[in-house]
Every structure is written in structure tokens, then in C-alpha cells.
């Protein structure tokens, strides 16, 4: 009995459906395998990223702990500074009468001095012994005894007319000038001191003009008076020069010290103009006044350093000056050293790429231009390993078309001969094709560099 045409057609349809179903199942299985391979590659990349980010997280945590510790230390040092300020008499007493307000022109410099004096308590002290307070107290007593007849700005009272001099003597008798307290950081050796002299011409009926003349840094122990301190002959029109010295000490700890003129000193009263015949004693007292002023400036400005330390600093500075050939070369060296200390990621990649080029010179099918397509056929890996182990395999027998074989050979030889772990799988390189991930290739090449350079 022959089958009907409908039965034959149904049988043909079932066979076609079976073939389609088998092909579809094969495609689904291949897709699942590709997805699993991709998932494994992603997991490995994530694990590598976490491994690389681990030291960074630990470093950030350590920096946070250091920041908290430094904040606590800064608070503790601030409290110590406040206690030292109260102990040495830096802060004015509550019952101290404030000086009466002066004119607008004459009150400009005291306001600046007060601002500097209020900001000088921001310095930091470290490693101070309790005996410093006693030394400061004794030093203040000696200064108070020696400077009883000298004003704070370094001027001695002139023998002027009767009305002007009587007012100055009365104000100084009622409230004697207090010596300026010396900062504790001045006792520390080898700290550069810069003295800045502000000279303001006042009491002449015109707008005051202030000039700043910075003196050279007093490091060794010598002091050169600024041109503003030169002794000028007496002139009929009396002018009063008020100088405020600002010492800027660069400390080794957390800040800088700025000591200004005390605001609690009595204001100066200038005698009115008088004919030249009434001022002959001032001409004889001008040299002594200039000498005393320079001695006062030298005693308040220079750091206390021993002779050996001063000679050592002088010789070191002289050797540095003679060693350098010029300012341009010194600046160029400094610029190169600063730029070399902070290397970027691109420069590291370029250095590693140049090293790989130097090791693979003369090898066929190797042209290293980047960390992606130049390594896609595996020949670069094989050439790099073969340059260190030429007897391990025959490089000339390799072909760029056999990518999987090249990857397997290079990774296996590097793992067996150089003990370099296989950070990249052959399947991953095959899946990524002609443009593999630059970070994966760079990471593995960096590992090869760390292991192969031992055999150089």
C-alpha cells in the first residue's frame, strides 16, 4: 500500500522541522558558550580592577587617619601656644588701658602693627622643653632693665622744645614702654630671618609716605643696616621716623611666625617746629641714636646661633653657589627634577613600550606601536619571550595567522621559564580579536617586564 501524498508531505515537514530545531539548538548552545566566556572575562577584569584598587583604598584610609592625627596634634599645639602666650605675657592684661585715638594719618601704621601682632599666635611649636618659659621670663627681665630708656621702635627721646619734650616725658613716666616679647621660635638655630623696615614720614602736615626696604636675610650672623637707617644731618623741620620690623621665620613645623610692634605702647607726641638755634644738642645725639637703634635692631632680629653652626651654614652656602654655573642651568635642573618626580601614566606606558621595542628589534612580524593591535596576533609576545630564552622554541617557525598557537606558546613559556602568571587567557585574546583591550595587554606586559628583567 503506497503512502498518500499528504503523508509524504507531512513526513518531509517533520524532517525539515527537526533539522531546523537541531540547528537552532546548536546556535543557542554556541551563544551560551560565548556568553559564559564573556562572563568569565568580565569577572577576571573586575577582579583585576579590584586588586589594583585595593592599595589605593588602603592609602586613602591611611591618609584619612594621618589627617585626623594631624588635626588632633594641631589642636594640642594650639592649646600649648595659648598657654605659652599667657605664661610669657604675649596677650595684653585685661586691665591695661588702651592708648587714646590719634589722627587718621598717624593711626594707619599702628593698625597694621596690631593686625600683625594678632596673627603671630598662629605658629606651631614642637619639641619645646618646660625650661623655655623660665628662660623667656629671665630674658624679658633683662630686656626690660636694658631698654628702660629706649622706645620700642628704636628711637631715643630727642631734647626738643620745652612744650613737646615735657609731653613726651610725662606720657613715658606715666606708662613706661613694655619691651616687645621675643618669639620662642627665635631660639631655634638655622632659621632664615628677614627684616623689613617701614619708614613713614609723619607730623609734617602732609600725607604720610611709607617706604619698604627689605634687608638681606640674616642667616650667618652678620647684619647690614638698610639705607633707611643711615644717619642724616639735622634739619630745621623735625620729622619723626617710626620703624616697625617684621620678622618672618620659616619654621620646620606647621606655620610661620610674624612678630610686629606692640600696640599697647604710648603714642608718640611730636614737638612743634622751632627755629634751628634751639636744636644744637640733637646734632651730637644723632650718631649715638643711630648706633643704639642698630644695636637694638641687631639684638631683636638675628637668631641665636653658635659660631660653629654659622661657619657650617656659610661654607654650605658657598659650596652651593660655586657648584652652580648659572641661574638658567639651576632653574632648568630644578624644573627637570620636579617634572621627573611626578610621572604620568602615559609616560610609564611609553617607557614600557620603548623597552619592548628594544627587546624585539630584528624580529619579523613585530611592529610595536601600541598596547592593542600590535599584540593581537601573539607574535610580539613570542618575540619578547624568545629574546630572553632563544633556545626555548623556534621563532622562525611561527606564523601570524596561527594566533591561538602563538598565544598559547608565549603564555606557557613565560609561565614555565620566567614564573610569570597567566593574567590573560588565550580564549580572551581570541574573543577580543584584532583590537584587544589595552589595559589587559598593558597589565600583562608589565608583569612580563617585572619577571623577565631578572634574566637581563
Curated annotation (Swiss-Prot):
<feature type="compositionally biased region" description="Polar residues">
    <location>
        <begin position="120"/>
        <end position="129"/>
    </location>
</feature>
<keyword id="KW-0597">Phosphoprotein</keyword>
<feature type="modified residue" description="Phosphoserine">
    <location>
        <position position="274"/>
    </location>
</feature>
<feature type="region of interest" description="Disordered">
    <location>
        <begin position="120"/>
        <end position="140"/>
    </location>
</feature>
<feature type="modified residue" description="Phosphothreonine">
    <location>
        <position position="96"/>
    </location>
</feature>
<feature type="domain" description="Calponin-homology (CH)">
    <location>
        <begin position="346"/>
        <end position="453"/>
    </location>
</feature>
<feature type="modified residue" description="Phosphoserine">
    <location>
        <position position="339"/>
    </location>
</feature>
<feature type="modified residue" description="Phosphoserine">
    <location>
        <position position="250"/>
    </location>
</feature>
<dbReference type="Pfam" id="PF00307">
    <property type="entry name" value="CH"/>
</dbReference>
<keyword id="KW-0175">Coiled coil</keyword>
<feature type="region of interest" description="Disordered">
    <location>
        <begin position="154"/>
        <end position="190"/>
    </location>
</feature>
<feature type="compositionally biased region" description="Low complexity">
    <location>
        <begin position="242"/>
        <end position="251"/>
    </location>
</feature>
<feature type="compositionally biased region" description="Polar residues">
    <location>
        <begin position="298"/>
        <end position="308"/>
    </location>
</feature>
<feature type="modified residue" description="Phosphoserine">
    <location>
        <position position="265"/>
    </location>
</feature>
<dbReference type="InterPro" id="IPR001715">
    <property type="entry name" value="CH_dom"/>
</dbReference>
<feature type="modified residue" description="Phosphothreonine">
    <location>
        <position position="270"/>
    </location>
</feature>
<dbReference type="InterPro" id="IPR050540">
    <property type="entry name" value="F-actin_Monoox_Mical"/>
</dbReference>
<feature type="compositionally biased region" description="Pro residues">
    <location>
        <begin position="268"/>
        <end position="279"/>
    </location>
</feature>
<feature type="modified residue" description="Phosphoserine">
    <location>
        <position position="98"/>
    </location>
</feature>
<comment type="similarity">
    <text>Belongs to the smoothelin family.</text>
</comment>
<feature type="coiled-coil region">
    <location>
        <begin position="24"/>
        <end position="88"/>
    </location>
</feature>
<feature type="compositionally biased region" description="Polar residues">
    <location>
        <begin position="163"/>
        <end position="174"/>
    </location>
</feature>
<feature type="modified residue" description="Phosphoserine">
    <location>
        <position position="131"/>
    </location>
</feature>
<dbReference type="InterPro" id="IPR036872">
    <property type="entry name" value="CH_dom_sf"/>
</dbReference>
<protein>
    <recommendedName>
        <fullName>Smoothelin-like protein 2</fullName>
    </recommendedName>
</protein>
<feature type="modified residue" description="Phosphoserine">
    <location>
        <position position="126"/>
    </location>
</feature>
<feature type="region of interest" description="Disordered">
    <location>
        <begin position="220"/>
        <end position="310"/>
    </location>
</feature>
<feature type="modified residue" description="Phosphoserine">
    <location>
        <position position="252"/>
    </location>
</feature>
<feature type="compositionally biased region" description="Basic and acidic residues">
    <location>
        <begin position="131"/>
        <end position="140"/>
    </location>
</feature>
Amino acid at each position: 500500500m503506497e503512502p498518500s501524498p499528504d503523508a509524504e508531505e507531512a513526513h518531509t515537514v517533520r524532517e525539515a522541522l527537526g533539522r531546523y530545531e537541531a540547528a537552532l539548538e546548536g546556535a543557542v548552545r554556541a551563544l551560551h558558550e560565548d556568553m559564559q566566556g564573556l562572563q568569565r572575562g568580565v569577572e577576571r577584569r573586575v577582579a583585576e580592577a579590584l586588586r589594583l584598587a585595593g592599595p589605593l583604598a588602603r592609602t586613602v584610609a591611611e591618609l584619612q587617619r594621618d589627617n585626623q592625627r594631624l588635626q588632633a596634634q594641631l589642636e594640642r599645639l594650639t592649646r600649648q601656644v595659648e598657654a605659652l602666650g599667657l605664661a610669657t605675657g604675649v596677650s595684653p592684661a585685661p586691665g591695661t588701658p588702651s592708648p587714646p585715638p590719634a589722627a587718621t594719618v598717624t593711626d594707619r601704621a599702628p593698625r597694621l602693627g596690631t593686625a600683625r601682632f594678632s596673627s603671630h599666635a598662629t605658629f606651631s611649636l614642637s619639641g619645646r622643653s618646660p625650661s623655655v618659659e623660665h628662660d623667656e621670663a629671665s630674658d624679658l627681665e633683662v630686656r626690660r632693665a636694658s631698654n628702660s630708656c629706649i622706645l620700642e621702635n628704636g628711637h631715643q627721646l630727642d631734647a626738643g622744645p620745652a612744650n613737646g619734650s615735657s609731653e613726651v616725658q610725662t606720657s613715658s613716666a606715666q606708662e613706661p614702654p613694655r619691651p616687645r616679647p621675643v618669639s620662642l621660635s627665635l631660639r631655634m638655630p638655622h632659621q632664615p630671618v628677614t627684616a623689613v623696615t617701614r619708614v613713614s614720614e609723619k607730623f609734617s602736615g602732609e600725607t604720610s609716605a611709607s617706604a619698604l626696604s627689605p634687608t638681606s636675610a640674616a642667616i650667618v650672623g652678620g647684619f647690614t643696616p638698610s639705607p633707611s637707617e643711615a644717619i642724616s644731618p639735622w634739619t630745621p623741620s623735625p620729622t619723626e621716623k617710626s620703624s616697625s620690623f617684621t620678622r618672618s621665620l620659616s619654621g620646620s613645623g606647621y606655620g610661620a611666625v610674624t612678630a610686629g610692634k606692640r600696640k599697647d605702647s604710648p603714642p608718640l607726641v611730636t614737638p612743634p617746629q622751632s627755629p634751628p638755634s634751639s636744636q644744637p644738642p640733637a646734632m651730637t645725639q644723632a650718631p649715638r641714636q643711630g648706633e643704639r637703634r642698630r644695636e637694638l635692631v641687631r639684638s631683636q632680629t638675628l637668631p641665636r646661633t653658635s659660631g660653629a653652626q654659622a661657619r657650617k651654614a656659610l661654607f654650605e652656602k658657598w659650596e652651593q653657589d660655586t657648584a652652580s654655573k648659572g641661574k638658567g642651568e639651576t632653574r632648568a635642573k630644578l624644573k627637570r627634577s620636579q617634572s621627573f618626580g611626578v610621572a604620568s601614566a602615559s609616560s610609564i606606558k611609553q617607557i614600557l613600550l620603548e623597552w619592548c621595542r628594544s627587546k624585539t628589534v630584528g624580529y619579523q612580524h613585530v611592529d610595536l606601536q601600541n598596547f592593542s593591535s600590535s599584540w593581537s596576533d601573539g607574535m610580539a609576545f613570542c618575540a619578547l619571550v624568545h629574546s630572553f630564552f632563544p633556545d626555548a622554541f623556534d621563532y622562525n617557525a611561527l606564523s601570524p595567522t596561527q594566533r591561538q598557537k602563538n598565544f598559547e606558546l608565549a603564555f606557557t613559556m613565560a609561565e614555565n621559564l620566567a614564573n610569570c602568571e597567566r593574567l590573560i587567557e588565550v580564549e580572551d585574546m581570541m574573543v577580543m580579536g584584532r583590537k584587544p583591550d589595552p589595559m589587559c595587554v598593558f597589565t600583562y606586559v608589565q608583569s612580563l617586564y617585572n619577571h623577565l628583567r631578572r634574566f637581563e
